[in-house]
Amino acid sequence: MSIGEMLAATVPMVRTLKLEYLETTPEKAVLALPDQSEYHNHVGGPHAGAMFTLGESASGAVVLAAFGDQLSRAVPLAVTAEIAYKKLARGTVTATATLGRPAADVVAELDEGRRPEFPVAVVIRREDGAVTGEMTVVWTLRPNN
């Protein structure tokens, strides 16, 4: 089962918004929010809440790809999230999330008995490539014990 399939099966908002997983690696995840009139805002583009969910979901996908092998001993949790809306979004938008620290450094902190935190940067773009939003989600790996 792919990360996209797993998240679609376990996170209802992924199914609700029909998010599409275009690429998922331990360094980067790319998701798309299809253009759907039921999730438009007052100016006919994707609602800010839908774009936030897209960005947070992309960040979660890269976290799972990078740290999926640690799930037996730690649970990934979003700590903070900040988004800046830059331009009007229209049509399908994509979110590209990139891990902000080397995964090995994060795992080393976990190995030391600490609860590591790390940023994931997200860029949201229209189909023409224009950046419509930028987001940072800080994640932690909370040890299970």
Feature map (PLM): residue ranges:
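HotDog/MaoC-like acyl-thioester-processing domains
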Residues: A89-R90, G100-N145
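Hydrophobic beta-strand-centered segment that forms part of the acyl-chain substrate-binding groove
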Residues: V62-R101
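Short structured motifs
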Residues: R15-L19, V79-Y85, D105-V107
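Short connector loops at helix/strand junctions that flank enzyme active sites
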Residues: T16, P26, P46, P76-T80, ...
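Catalytic strand-loop segment that frames the active site of acyl-thioester-processing enzymes
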Residues: T16-P46
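Extreme N-terminal tail/first-helix region
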Residues: M1-P12
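Hot-dog-fold acyl-thioester-processing enzymes
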Residues: P34, E38-A61, S72
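N-terminal intrinsically disordered, cationic/polar leader segments
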Residues: V14-R15, E134
